[in-house]
């Protein structure tokens, strides 16, 4: 399974976003979730799973080729899983550090991210329900045959996504710090008009933006204009 995809907004802008985990990539294939506490604005993402064929294509590209195409009901089920993962991600991701000093403290392990909320039991149940299904079996490359080749069902692919979500949220938890005391690797984009959630796999845990192409560059432009105005 690989991560990263081109996403777009309802307004038509598009950029490449690697959320760092396949479950988070799946969560960002449309809409995304409101922050019920009102801390962050909603990110209005365009719908990437508009049809059963879109779902087949996405899962085939990110897991294994799907043997039998999705039905309309399976598309609804997949969107329900997506919404549950998105809400859990918003609940688990702390508000981004707003100052350089806070970012340094978080990276050094001196400050845990704040602003998490309690997850909804129904969302946890949804992820667990899909994760309980058989997932895509691993296979060792290099052989001439592969057991189960061309027999990956849509339910298996969704189970793989759900299991990744389960592993992710077990790792990061929903408290202010992880079980081992380290700051969480789950972060929100620091842009005020974004709020997308990603898993920060950088060595120092200092990733700030959903994408440098979009929010990172826009922040640089704003900072440059502010410096020019102050001169």
Model-predicted regions and their roles:
Residues 163, 230-231:
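Intrinsically disordered, low-complexity regulatory regions of eukaryotic proteins
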Residues 188-193, 212-214:
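Short, cysteine/histidine-rich loop/knuckle motifs that typically chelate Zn2+
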Residues 200-201:
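Conserved binding/catalytic microenvironments
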Residues 205-216:
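Cysteine-rich micro-motifs
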Residues 1-188, 195:
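Short helix-coil boundary/hinge micro-motifs
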Residues 214-229:
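Basic DNA-binding region of bZIP-type proteins
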